């Protein structure tokens, strides 16, 4: 968890824009523009759409002149980004826009359920003897818990944890899950689970991964909106296979 207010202040002091990826939190839980950010990015593929059937992104911002930037460019932020969008061709299709607008209708209720389930699972994992560590901003044990409380109204549905053991134990756990789907994406109504060491970060050497805290026993969950008792039962049964 990063201090958005502090980052924005440092960026502005040096004549730079502050951009925040708000995909995990969504506008339901965090509004970076109100915290000093200039640009907010969303992978709308994820929570804003919420149904795993769109590939789309968006930038949100309050328009402003860019004369204060170190490069001295005088056009507005909107004009600059609109030019880049036109030049690059990053324009979504009508059907993609329709699907995201459909998802936005249920964003608030979905995010509340994502968070409730994630918190429940995080607390369960934190007390399990086969789990080494749980990282979820909603837990008091999270090192940036107080910071998260100061800039968000919720903590979302993403969490990571480390299993006691290494690659063999983690692999057995992942092979045993029934409700969770083994996949790299996130933010849909269905629960996903992934193993960064052999999936999203497989190309990074072990020594570099471990410096980043991404060991062979790290697991990431995108907690969906299913019945939480079913999700916990799936996790508990899978941990019993280790």
Where are these regions (language model features)?
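Conserved PLP-enzyme active-site core in the AAT-like
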Residues: 1-130, 135
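PLP-dependent enzyme catalytic core of the Aspartate aminotransferase-like
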Residues: 4, 110, 175, 191-242
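Structural motif
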Residues: 15-18, 38-39, 58, 98, ...
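Active-site beta-loop-alpha junctions enriched in small/polar residues
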Residues: 23-25, 139, 164, 224-226
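Short, acidic Gly/Pro/Ser/Thr-rich loop/turn segments
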Residues: 66-67, 107, 166-169, 200, ...
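Short, flexible turn/loop "capping" segments at secondary-structure junctions
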Residues: 92-96, 151-154, 211-216
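Short, well-ordered beta-strand elements within core beta-sheets of diverse protein domains
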Residues: 99-109, 156-164, 220-224
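Conserved small-domain helix->loop->beta segment predominantly found in fold-type I
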Residues: 119-187, 204-210
């Amino acid at each position: 968890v990063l201090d958005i207010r502090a980052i924005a202040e440092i960026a502005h002091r040096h004549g730079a824009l502050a951009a925040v990826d708000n995909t995990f939190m969504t506008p339901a839980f965090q509004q970076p523009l109100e915290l000093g950010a200039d640009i907010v990015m969303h992978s709308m593929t994820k929570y804003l759409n919420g149904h795993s059937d769109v590939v789309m992104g968006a930038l949100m911002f309050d328009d402003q002149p860019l004369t204060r930037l170190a490069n001295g460019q005088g056009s507005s932020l909107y004009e600059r980004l609109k030019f880049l969008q036109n030049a690059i061709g990053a324009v979504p299709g009508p059907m993609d826009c329709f699907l995201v607008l459909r998802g936005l209708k249920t964003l608030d209720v979905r995010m509340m359920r994502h968070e409730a389930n994630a918190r429940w699972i995080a607390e369960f994992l934190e007390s399990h003897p086969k789990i080494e560590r749980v990282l979820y901003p909603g837990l008091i044990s999270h090192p940036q818990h107080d910071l998260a409380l100061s800039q968000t109204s919720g903590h979302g549905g993403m969490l990571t944890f480390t299993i006691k053991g290494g690659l063999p134990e983690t692999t057995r756990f992942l092979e045993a899950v029934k409700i969770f789907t083994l996949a790299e994406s996130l933010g849909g109504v269905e629960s996903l689970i992934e193993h960064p060491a052999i999936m999203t970060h497989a190309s990074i050497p072990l020594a570099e991964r471990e410096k980043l805290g991404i060991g062979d026993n790290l697991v990431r969950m995108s907690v969906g909106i299913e019945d939480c008792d079913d999700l916990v039962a799936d996790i508990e049964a899978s941990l019993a296979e280790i």
